[in-house]
Amino acid sequence: MKDKVSFPFSPDRPLCVPKLFTISAPAGAGKTTLVRMLAEEFPDSFQKTVSLTTRSPRPEEVHGVDYYFVSQEEFLKRLDSGDFLEWVALFGEYYGTSRLEIDKIWKSGKHAIAVIDVEGALALRSKIPTVTIFISAPSLEELERRLKHRGSEQDAQRQERLQHSLIEQAASSKFEYVIINDDLEKSYEILKSIFIAEEHRNVL
């Protein structure tokens, strides 16, 4: 039987049970920007989980904010200790979500938002009641344009990510909500309405 993780009740918001939201999307679909907008507007309600990864940080990324950047040795050590609720090897690097990270956010009375890949989101849902959201780019051509504009991958890496995006897009039907991000402000309003509705959903 898989481990189950129960929600703590928030003393500051007694009618609200902290939830876990997962947001998944192909690279370049806009998930990071949308989550940042949500956290900035609702800092007392939502907090993004910080995953661990063995990959090198991009120029704009900050340790402890975007990811915890760790060595492969440290990652595998924490994996062996059972620290991860989910983990995945992707593009030759490891990524994982710590159970302690989610618990810390819940105990603060906030909802946790995990920005993770499709496989990780579905793995989390098998262990924890999870609201799953998929962000899609309007087309593969637009996704490729955004990846080129980001400029953080070589051509071969970009093509690999595009192929992986097709696989992730095919899995979008397994998610409760799907948002096509063809307009950032419109997509944010849709995302915000989902979070507000879920926060007020009764736990029966």
Curated annotation (Swiss-Prot):
Annotated ranges, domain Guanylate kinase-like: 18-196
InterPro entries: GK/Ca_channel_bsu, Guanylate_kin-like_dom, Guanylate_kinase, Guanylate_kinase_CS, P-loop_NTPase
Subcellular location: Cytoplasm
EC number: 2.7.4.8
Chief site of localization: cytoplasm
Record keywords: ATP-binding, Cytoplasm, Kinase, Nucleotide-binding, Transferase
Residues annotated as binding ATP: 25-32
Highest taxon of the lineage: Bacteria
GO CC, one annotated term: cytosol
A GO MF label: ATP binding
Coiled-coil boundaries: none
Catalytic activity field: GMP + ATP = GDP + ADP
Primary role: Essential for recycling GMP and indirectly, cGMP.
Similarity-based family: Belongs to the guanylate kinase family.
NCBIfam families assigned to the protein according to its UniProt record, in alphabetical order: guanyl_kin
This protein's name: Guanylate kinase
Source organism per UniProt: Chlamydia felis (strain Fe/C-56)
Protein encoded by which gene: gmk
